[in-house]
């Protein structure tokens, strides 16, 4: 069922946010922990957005499928752009759709969709796909300006 699956995803996302906060509060952060946390975030994003893509392929129009695909790939590109920029000494903490926003914009409508409101998830995917593309553009433009300053 959709609703229990979404509730489990919300639980995992919340616990993921909590473990990073707890590590910072206890001054137990480190390079390995940061690397592992970022890597596991990508796995979680892949599972969440991949699941939505599979659902869209089974039940939605080609447009909704494309929006889900843009959200999946664009989400990875948003994260990669920041990591790559930081690896060459540039700042990249810009964009209107950071990970938390992307997850909220997806999971709440997915929950409502699971309760039987069919148009909510497709609408959220269309909005999120646009926000993801804007965020990718913002990050690329920001890094380009810094690199050519």
Predicted regions mapped to residue ranges:
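Basic, amphipathic juxtamembrane/active-site segments
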Residues: 6-10, 20-66
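Hydrophobic alpha-helical transmembrane segments
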Residues: 1-3, 13, 47-149
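Conserved G/P- and acidic residue-centered "switch" motifs that form tight phosphate/ATP-binding loops
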Residues: 16, 37, 75
């Amino acid at each position: 069922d959709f609703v229990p699956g979404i509730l489990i995803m919300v639980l995992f996302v919340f616990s993921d946010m909590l473990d990073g906060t707890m590590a910072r509060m206890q001054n137990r952060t480190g390079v390995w922990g940061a690397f592992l946390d970022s890597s596991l975030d990508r796995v979680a994003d892949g599972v969440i957005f991949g699941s939505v893509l599979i659902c869209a392929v089974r039940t939605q129009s080609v447009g909704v499928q494309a929006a889900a695909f843009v959200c999946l790939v664009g989400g990875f590109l948003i994260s990669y752009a920041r990591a790559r920029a930081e690896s060459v000494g540039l700042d990249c903490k810009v964009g209107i759709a950071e990970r938390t926003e992307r997850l909220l914009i997806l999971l709440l409508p997915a929950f409502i969709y699971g309760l039987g409101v069919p148009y909510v998830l497709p609408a959220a995917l269309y909005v999120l796909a646009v926000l993801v593309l804007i965020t990718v553009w913002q990050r690329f433009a920001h890094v380009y300006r810094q690199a050519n300053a």
